[in-house]
């Protein structure tokens, strides 16, 4: 029985040693896993931060591009509006053809009313008769 007890004792020591090694191995593996997870997490966070920064920068660039296009479009619309108003003024006789496109000093203004067709015979503006008009009474 002594041999049997000695064998069981040795087996127990082996199991304890194996358990210690397993515990140590599991702890080491857990530590490495934790390091790996933290590393991946930090790299993912860096990637997300970089990605968000990149998206924000691209959005800013696109807004700048769109803003520039809007300003350019508004400028073009304003220019065409001025040209159209000048055409109407000349065609109706509000302004004489030789007065169009000149600033206060009498110098021609650039970009206004270029190649505008004007009827040179229409020098005066006549008011239409009032027979076809009705007075407007706003509703209260």
From Swiss-Prot:
Q: Which residues carry this modification: Phosphotyrosine?
A: 125
At which residues is N-acetylmethionine found? 1
Question: In its UniProt record, which GO terms are filed under biological process?
Answer: chemical synaptic transmission; regulation of dopamine secretion; synapse organization; synaptic vesicle endocytosis
**InterPro entries xrefs:** Synuclein, Synuclein_alpha
PTM? Phosphorylated, predominantly on serine residues. Phosphorylated on Tyr-125 upon osmotic stress.
Extract the Gene3D superfamilies matched here.
Answer: Helix hairpin bin
Q: Which Pfam families match?
A: Synuclein
What GO MF terms are annotated? Answer: copper ion binding; cuprous ion binding; identical protein binding
Q: Which UniProt keywords apply?
A: Acetylation, Cell projection, Copper, Cytoplasm, Membrane, Metal-binding, Nucleus, Phosphoprotein, Repeat, Secreted, Synapse, Ubl conjugation
Q: According to the UniProt entry, which residues carry Phosphoserine?
A: 87, 129
Function, as annotated, reads: Neuronal protein that plays several roles in synaptic activity such as regulation of synaptic vesicle trafficking and subsequent neurotransmitter release. Participates as a monomer in synaptic vesicle exocytosis by enhancing vesicle priming, fusion and dilation of exocytotic fusion pores. Mechanistically, acts by increasing local Ca(2+) release from microdomains which is essential for the enhancement of ATP-induced exocytosis.
Q: What is this protein called?
A: Alpha-synuclein
